[in-house]
């Protein structure tokens, strides 16, 4: 496709996108009746043996796809703590898509590395988290929790004399993983992915708002990880961090904060008391595609000790020479990844 045709196609995409956004306040929030069926029927065909016209592909995408979307980008959608996208972030993502960068390393994209490093620094500043913490921008809180708890797993087992990176988990000491009775389902998924299992966690009793009760906490021995919530998904309540973290420190436990939406309370002078003590944890996971209204997907993982994060997620290869700058593939679950900073 020549440059003029490309410009025309991008202009048409921008026009269709603007029309979609302008219509959000007038359309129903859920997909339009019958839209999903019409979309499925429109693309029910074998894999094409020849090329398709780009303009026609775009038209099909919009004409059949847009009515089958949920209006979560609009102001009348209140489901699942789903954010929209501010105009500036939508425009920035459009440009970033045109760049088509692999944000794996500084060498593959200096711009992506610098933007991500700056964005994470700002997040630490506004949330009052340790400036020396290492972090990555992942797909969402699930993978942010994964990155943080991978660091936690490897660190607590290393302190027990077990090298997970070299030996795996077979034969390793069994860490105690402590959560509240109303732990978020995605965190249990992460614990399963990391080899802890969903059913062998220690579940602490909670109050009527889903907060972990700080009285009568059990004694622990050996490697341990405590997961607390900054914002219960059903009530918005915060676990009592000062008491729980104090208990965890007496047992040499790693403390992780699942703060997908609630951790941002720390950025508000009015709401910051809710997040009191959360900055004393060892790792934090949150989302940018909720309160910050950046386009999906964008989760944030931060770990107090950079060596713990790198120790769990680093990669080596003859063609992967360290740049001396931010190489995201050394501290993120993914290697190939889009620019999210």
Please identify what each model-predicted range represents.
Residues 147-150, 189-192, 237-240, 265-271, ...:
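Short acidic, glycine/serine/threonine-rich loops at helix termini
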Residues 232, 276-341:
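Active-site C-terminal subdomain of aminotransferase-like
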Residues 211-256:
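Active-site phosphate-binding strand-loop segment of PLP-dependent enzymes
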Residues 216, 238-250, 262-281:
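Active-site pre-lysine segment of PLP-dependent enzymes
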Residues 82-96, 102-221:
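PLP-dependent aspartate aminotransferase-fold enzymes
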Residues 183, 232, 261-263, 290:
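Active-site-proximal loop/turn and secondary-structure-junction residues that shape catalytic pockets
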Residues 1-132:
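N-terminal entrance/gating region of PLP-dependent enzymes' catalytic architecture
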């Amino acid at each position: 496709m020549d440059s003029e045709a490309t410009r025309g196609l991008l202009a048409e995409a921008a026009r269709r996108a603007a029309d979609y956004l302008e219509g959000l306040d007038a359309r129903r929030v859920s997909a339009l009746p019958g839209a999903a069926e019409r979309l499925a029927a429109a693309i029910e065909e074998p894999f094409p043996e020849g090329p398709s016209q780009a303009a026609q592909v775009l038209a099909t995408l919009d004409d059949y796809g847009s009515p089958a979307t949920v209006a979560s980008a609009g102001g009348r959608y209140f489901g699942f703590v789903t954010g929209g996208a501010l105009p500036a972030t939508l425009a920035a993502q459009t440009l970033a898509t045109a760049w088509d960068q692999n944000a794996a390393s500084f060498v593959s994209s200096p711009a992506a590395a610098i933007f991500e490093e700056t964005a994470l620094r700002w997040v630490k500043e506004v949330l009052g988290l340790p400036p020396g913490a290492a972090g990555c921008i992942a797909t969402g809180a699930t993978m942010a929790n994964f990155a943080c708890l991978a660091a936690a797993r490897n660190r607590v087992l290393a302190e027990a004399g077990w090298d997970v990176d070299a030996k795996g988990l077979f034969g390793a000491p069994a860490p105690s993983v402590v959560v509240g009775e109303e732990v978020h389902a995605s965190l249990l998924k992460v614990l399963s992915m990391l080899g802890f299992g969903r059913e062998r966690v220690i579940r602490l009793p909670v109050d009527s708002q889903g907060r972990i009760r700080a009285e009568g906490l059990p004694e622990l021995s050996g490697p341990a990880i405590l997961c607390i919530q900054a914002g219960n998904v059903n009530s918005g309540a915060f676990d009592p961090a000062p008491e729980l973290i104090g208990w965890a420190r007496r047992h040499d436990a790693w403390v992780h904060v699942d703060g997908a939406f609630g951790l941002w309370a720390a950025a508000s002078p009015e709401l910051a008391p809710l997040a009191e003590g959360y900055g004393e944890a060892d790792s934090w996971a949150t989302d940018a595609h909720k309160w910050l209204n950046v386009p999906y997907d964008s989760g944030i993982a931060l770990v107090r000790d950079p060596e713990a994060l790198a120790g769990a997620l680093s990669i080596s290869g003859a063609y992967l020479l360290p740049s001396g700058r931010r190489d995201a593939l050394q501290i993120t679950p993914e290697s190939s990844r889009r620019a999210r900073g």
